[in-house]
Amino acid sequence: SAIALVPDSEWGYRAGEAFTDFWIAEGGNLVSFARYGDSTSHADLLESNLHVDASIARKNALQGNLGRALEFTPRRRQDVDALFLAASPQQARQLKPMLAFFFAEDIPVYATSSIYSGFPDPSADRDLDGVKFSTMPWILNNDNELRNNLSNQTNASATALRMQALGIDSFYLSQRLIQLYEAPDTIYRGILGKLSKDSQSNDLEREQVWAQFIGGLARPVNN
């Protein structure tokens, strides 16, 4: 069972819908779909969707019935196995630390690639430790000479880096399309990820890599 937490925007809605469709198709259960905005109290949103407010309400009702104060530690809902987060780096840096405040630091968080700026920033991203996200190998390869040269020349953002990767792989793929379509099992390992042809639709499919924030740095996950 999962909670989806997405921004209150057109992109956030699309990301949330895509996750919901996939999750349910895979047999998952979505227990909450929450949308946050710039004016939304993130604390209130998390407290409500994690049912911490309900725990506090039960305590208050019990105190009222007994007529005395009780020692009490609020509890979050126990039917959540994962949290899907669609967020920018700035949004995620606000939201992720609050999970611990609401007793949910043990819930695995899986995010969209938008959570990572594309450039190492351990002091800013330390609050994201533990979050896993999928991305293209190009974004994680800080030692790639071509990537660094393009980045330095264009002062590239993460979005620009992704567009550059698309252009580079498109060029090389144009020379390998016949091979991809004639040999169904062919896999092209590009900087976008593993590219192959779907046997039914003939569309090109891309398999990205997984990364996790460890010590404020985005590091590849082996499996």
Where are these predicted regions, by residue range?
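Active-site proximal loops enriched in glycine and acidic residues that flank catalytic Cys/His/Asp
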Residues: 6, 87, 111-114, 135, ...
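Surface-exposed patches in mature extracellular/periplasmic domains of secreted proteins
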Residues: 2-7, 31-33, 107-109, 161-163, ...
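Segments of small-molecule ligand-sensing domains
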Residues: 152-221
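N-terminal post-signal-peptidase region of extra-cytosolic proteins
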Residues: 69, 94-97
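Hydrophobic alpha-helical segments within soluble ligand-binding/sensing domains
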Residues: 1-3, 14-18, 137-145, 166-173
